[in-house]
Amino acid sequence: MFKTRERLQWKDVRFLTKKRQVFSQGLLTIFYVEQYPNRKFHQFSFHIPLLVSKRAVVRHKVKRILINSLEKQISTLNFWWKYYKCYITLHKMKLQQLLEILDKKNSNQLISYLENENTKAFTSFCQFLWKKH
């Protein structure tokens, strides 16, 4: 779980979605903006839509897997020359494979699938930011 200062507040989420700087790769869609110059840390927030499951327990499980995966990657990602605010959500049009895995109720397969998608998305995001700056 992220520390409180590393989590986005709702006013930040609204700002990011209005700003419309978006990166989409595979299952994840990332809304991002550069962090304020006086803040030397990243801020992240995840949103799991109701299309995944109407049960909050299932959505929370997916969210925890993504958060843990991102925490593992943070030390190895290569976009630390600048700090960012990122709001991450699942791409609603690409949920079919995730829903099939959730129907099977195979926890290990779910974890490996989400970690793989998260890794691919954030390495592509880092490369995108590197080319941009």
Regions found by a protein language model. Name each.
Residues M1-H133:
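Positively charged, solvent-exposed patches that mediate nucleic-acid binding
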